Amino acid sequence: MVEKKTTMTLLEEGQIQIHTENIFPIIKKAVYSDHEVFLRELVSNGVDAISKRRMAAVTGDCSEVEEGLIEIKIDREAKTLTISDNGIGMTSEEVKRYINQVAFSSAEDFLEKYKKESDVIIGHFGLGFYSSFMVAKNVELITKSACPESQAVIWSCDGSPKFTLNEGEREHPGTDVILHLMDDELEYIEPTRIRTLITKYCDFMPVEVSLEGEPINKRN
């Protein structure tokens, strides 16, 4: 669940480190022929985060999670779609490493080689999070690591290479991805549409996926 925001301390603002400025137009417009798969990517990220938390808990590196959960919430008034998980979360340093540093030594060559087959890019580089920008004009990520003494942080980006990273508030470990939808992508604040996508892409994922508190997927 997303907690109410208060005044936050700015930790950093800067530019996402990318090898080519072509990557954002590709992600925003042509990563997939069908924009709807952003939901699959974000839910899959949440499932991965839950698995990582379970593995880390075995070694005592972080707190345990009793049952993994992906929650999806719609705010029609704010035109937002939020995907939340109770996975391992991230520290500010991990956000900088995994979210800001979209940089790979072979990125430019790969983009050039596969620019007409852009579906491949997400899977090859693990850029599933950035599929958010196919439907959102602004993306906020609120995350808190399951490691002891961790401070929650809020990362925000408007689809350009610029970002802000602030101290945030989140009661429990996990991550919220808040999509501020573009005006021509408002189909994704329709409950029926989201329910259909959960059934299509997430039915047999190994954790519960709920919409407004109602479990939707069948699970394994």
Residue ranges, per PLM feature:
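Intrinsically disordered or highly flexible coil/loop and linker segments, enriched in small
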Residues: 36-37, 108, 204-207, 211
